[in-house]
From Swiss-Prot:
GO terms for molecular function: galacturan 1,4-alpha-galacturonidase activity; polygalacturonase activity. It comes from Aspergillus flavus (strain ATCC 200026 / FGSC A1120 / IAM 13836 / NRRL 3357 / JCM 12722 / SRRC 167). The lineage of its organism: Eukaryota, Fungi, Dikarya, Ascomycota, Pezizomycotina. Belongs to the glycosyl hydrolase 28 family. One of its GO terms (cellular component) is extracellular region. This is Probable exopolygalacturonase B.
Length: 435
């Protein structure tokens, strides 16, 4: 009798599991190692898990958003969603994935968003901060995304239609989606994948804790020379504690790494930035009456090539802006080549005339900053100046140190370091701004 009841129960459970499947999907238990290996649902860095597969898209218009959401829900609480190598999965509907708890997503294929601009302009997740929108949002705890695959923002149409516009223009109403966004996420990691052609910022982390990226390649390029990618930052953050980026390469045409307000405990190591606006702290201080901070950052072993800026601190100035501090930041072992402004403190951000900046200076304090072992060349665009540290008269800039700086300029020798309004000895000879 016991055997009969057990058999009946097992049969019922199996029947329920089959009934829950959608066409083209599969649920493989963690004990079935052969089946896991057959589909590629195995990774030596992570233990075997219940693995879910879904059907791939037949073409670039075959939206599998509902299948993807089904797969995420069934992989939640201890499972893994596998997106197979050689397959494409097209997402054409916004997805709220903020319910996650102990899940892995193995991205070995291509996950691609549609470029239906009219749909995404009306259907997205909107955030007031710099009028940000996204295709989807990820949240919850213990989330791992890994693999050898591609997350494709399909940005070319967005580049074409946004050409000549500016994201920070108060009249701008052409909002472009962020490729990957977390909100209220704790312990989320991304490893091994490529992120391609985000319409706007590539990654934006909001109200999250312990975010890590390792061995990721981020690239944004355009096939239209008159419509290049714009605002395609590699990494941005807002209200985040614990942000780590290691062994990563970024080629985007805007900020390589740029934590925004209230980001603390930052660690960056072994980062290569090509054709970017640099590794920036900020910008902060944008919104009237609001206090922002960036604090406790350690940036080490970074290479910056062919860019606008290298190591940069940036804060807003103007009549209606905020205040705050950038504190305890270390840039160490930084190699910079062919870069307009290798080391810069910019407290006249953004797009503000010198007269207005002088009338309404930044109120962001900059303290405990170390630039150590910085070497390479500028582009010569700013003459012989290789470091430009000009502090706002309405802010405190103190304990700023430059050690072992070996930067040269093709504009001539000796290279010049500008410092103005900085309290105390900065460790090297410097001169006042010529402006």
């Amino acid at each position: 009798m016991k055997f009969f009841l057990a058999t009946l129960f097992a049969s019922a459970v199996s029947s329920i599991a089959v009934d829950r499947l959608i066409p083209g999907a599969q649920i493989i238990p963690e004990s079935d190692t052969r089946a896991l290996l057959r589909v590629g649902g195995h990774h030596d860095k992570y233990h075997d898990r219940r693995t879910i597969t879904i059907r791939p898209s037949r073409n670039d218009t075959d939206d599998v958003s509902r299948d993807f959401l089904w797969g995420i829900k069934h992989a939640n609480h201890g499972g893994r969603l596998l997106l197979k190598k050689g397959e494409k999965y097209v997402i054409g509907r916004k997805l709220d994935l903020t319910f996650l708890d102990d899940i892995e997503v193995q991205l070995d294929g291509e996950l691609k968003f549609t470029d239906d601009v009219s749909y995404w302009q009306e259907n997205n997740f909107y955030y007031d901060f710099q009028k940000s929108i996204t295709f989807w949002r990820w949240g919850g705890k213990d989330i791992k995304i890994f693999g050898t695959g591609l997350l494709n923002g399909n940005g070319q149409r967005w580049y074409n239609e946004f050409a000549g516009q500016e994201i920070l223009d108060p009249d701008n109403e052409y909002y472009r989606p962020i490729l990957f966004l977390t909100e209220n996420a704790t312990r989320i990691s991304v490893e091994g994948i490529t992120q391609l052609n985000s319409p706007c910022w590539t990654n934006f982390f909001i109200q999250s804790k312990d975010v890590s990226f390792d061995d990721v390649y981020i690239h944004a390029f355009s096939t239209n020379k008159s419509a290049l990618p714009k605002n395609s930052d590699g990494f941005d953050s807002l209200n985040v504690d614990g942000l780590t980026v290691t062994n990563t390469r970024v080629d985007v045409g805007d900020d390589c790494f740029s934590p925004k307000p209230n980001t603390t405990n930052i660690f960056v190591q072994n980062l290569l930035c090509n054709n970017t606006h640099g590794v920036s702290m900020g910008s902060i201080g944008q919104y009237p009456g609001v206090m922002d901070i960036i604090e406790h950052a350690y940036i080490e072993n970074v290479t910056l090539l062919n860019g606008q800026n290298g190591a940069r601190l940036k804060a807003w100035a103007g009549q209606d802006v905020g205040y705050g501090r950038i504190n305890n930041i270390t840039y160490k072992n930084i190699r910079i080549e062919n870069t307009d402004a290798p080391v810069v403190l910019d407290q006249c951000y953004f797009d503000i005339e010198a007269a207005e900046c002088a009338q309404y200076p930044s109120q962001v304090n900059v303290t405990n900053i170390l630039f150590e072992n910085i070497s390479g060349t500028s582009s010569g665009k700013n003459g012989k100046v290789v470091a430009d540290l000009v502090c706002s008269p309405n802010a405190v800039c103190s304990d700023i140190q430059l050690k072992n700086i070996n930067l040269t300029s093709p504009a001539g020798s000796p290279p010049e370091i500008v410092c103005e309004g900085v309290q105390g000895d900065i460790g090297v000879e410097c001169q006042a701004s010529a402006d």
